[in-house]
Amino acid sequence: MCSSDLVKHISGELFNDLLKYIRKQTGMELPAVGEYWSNDLGRLLYYLDSCENEMSLFDVPLHYNFFSASQAGGAYDLRTILDNTLMKERPQNAVTFVDNHDTQRGQSLQSAVGDWFKDHCYAIIMLRQGGLPCVFYSDYHGNPVRETPAVLNLGKMIMLRHFYAYGEQEDYFESQNLIGWVRRGDEEHSNSGLAAVLSNGDNSGPLHMFMGEKFADAVFSDVLGNCTEKVTIGKDGWADFSCVPGRVSIWVTQEAFENLIVYE
């Protein structure tokens, strides 16, 4: 992995030539990521074009969308959470993240995402197609010095991505305070497939979503434990998925639920 800080001060053309040279000399398709700290998607796209997409960039606009959503609460329209982001516009070049060392409280770019909203953010970057997710150390382990707690469900999100977040994706961004999506799994990953429901207000659903006829009669459970009732997929592949108001539910097959092992 090649990485560079403050790439806005280095021409994209230079990185284009440099990365091609390194890959040719090593015979390896080394991935590369740069930090271009700007909330202006146009600037990031221009830079990626200038280096001919030879590198990825941290998705700073997505971080600021997360921050804004965590500050606004139910007034934020979740249907717009991906607007003007690399994850949406250039997913193959997006390194997605929730927070980092610079966005922590007291730092120069302070814009720490509210703790209540971090499950929502990690569900988006870990369980959707598009973008390469980057987990912040302090979110996984906590930071006692800054009195920042660990994101308790982050370990589960990581394992969900590894084992079950595969296959075709379909979005159900149906209301301001309630969105969801499904991943329909694939043949290569046993029990893969999931349904995600995110609420940032009083709306708990349900969302009527199509998992696919191959899941007919399958029983799904909420891995995060926010909903205790199980959901049975209809013979037509459709089902109603809910979540607790203001929280997140990730639904997987009962077999996947029972097999899920989280290493804390």
Task: List each model region and its residues.
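Active-site-proximal helices and loops of the catalytic beta/alpha 8
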Residues: 6-264
